[in-house]
Regions:
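Hydrophobic secretory-pathway targeting helix
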Residues: 1-34
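Individual transmembrane alpha-helix segments
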Residues: 66-103, 185-197
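Juxtamembrane non-transmembrane "cap" segments at the membrane-aqueous interface
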Residues: 147-174
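Terminal transmembrane helical module of multi-pass membrane proteins
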Residues: 167-225
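C-terminal TM-helix exit segments that contain a strictly Trp-centered aromatic cap at the helix terminus
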Residues: 21-29, 67, 142-155
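Membrane-interface interhelical loops and short interface/amphipathic helices
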Residues: 34-76, 82
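Membrane-interfacial loop-to-transmembrane-helix junctions in polytopic alpha-helical membrane proteins
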Residues: 1-11, 82-95, 122-129, 180
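Juxtamembrane interface at the cytosolic side of transmembrane helices
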Residues: 2-7, 104-154, 204-227
Length: 231
């Protein structure tokens, strides 16, 4: 029984950073204003020859494609290699969606089952696990951030080797996809997701710490009342 409790608790802690990161990734992927920000910042219009309205139209169609059942992105702007790579990107995004739903489902089921079984005694343990999960989120992103500062190229290469089973991501410098989405575009997107996840982790951890502090004070008062009663 103790082993099962430990395993389910560890999975709960793991699901916290998974849920935060996939949720923020989903938001970033679908938030068209982030695309607009990147296009303006990196002067994509000048690089591609497309005006801002055309760029946003392509981005909007791309977001729709990521959330559709279409196998390929039907657009003349990209060549076959780019379109095929975009299919792989869509698969990665859809995987993130599934991980988001799976982690959310596990967290909800875990909380409901433990509350039914343990009632009020569960809240202290839940608060601790939320703090651990929040801490794990911040630690993971801190490690990745430090790695990126020390050797970004190796992190970038490892991400693509793990994420894709082919070399289609190695596009030519003149390909429209690279011109539309330069490396800085993805760096900013990653920073947005990381900052959002860290902020959410701090909030969750802070609330959980507050719950522990309040319950600790309540228990302390009960002990004092009990001691005074006996006295």
């Amino acid at each position: 029984m103790k082993a099962l409790t430990a395993i389910t608790s560890i999975l709960f802690v793991i699901c916290i950073p998974m849920l935060l990161l996939t949720t923020d990734l989903r938001f970033a992927t679908n938030y068209i204003r982030l695309y607009e920000y990147g296009f303006n910042k990196y002067e994509v219009s000048a690089a591609t020859g497309l005006d801002n309205e055309e760029l946003l139209s392509v981005a909007d169609r791309m977001v729709t494609y990521f959330n559709s059942d279409e196998e390929f992105f039907d657009i003349d702007l990209f060549n076959q290699r780019e379109v095929t790579h975009l299919k792989d990107v869509k698969g990665l995004i859809q995987l993130a969606y599934r991980l988001q739903l799976a982690s959310l489902a596990y967290i909800v089921v875990y909380i409901v089952i433990n509350f039914v079984l343990r009632r009020g005694a569960f809240w202290r343990g839940l608060a601790r696990r939320l703090i651990w999960g929040s801490g794990a989120t911040i630690a993971l992103l801190a490690i990745l951030g430090l790695w990126a500062v020390i050797d970004f190229d190796s992190l970038f290469l490892l991400f693509h080797l793990v994420s894709f089973s082919n070399e289609l991501w190695q596009l030519s410098p003149g390909d429209k996809m690279l011109l539309m989405f330069p490396q800085g575009f993805f760096n900013d997107g990653a920073l947005f997701v990381a900052a959002a996840a860290i902020g959410e982790a701090v909030i969750i951890g802070g609330i959980a710490w507050g719950i522990l502090a309040l319950r600790g004070k309540a228990n302390y008062k009960k002990v004092l009342v009990h001691a005074n009663g006996e006295g």
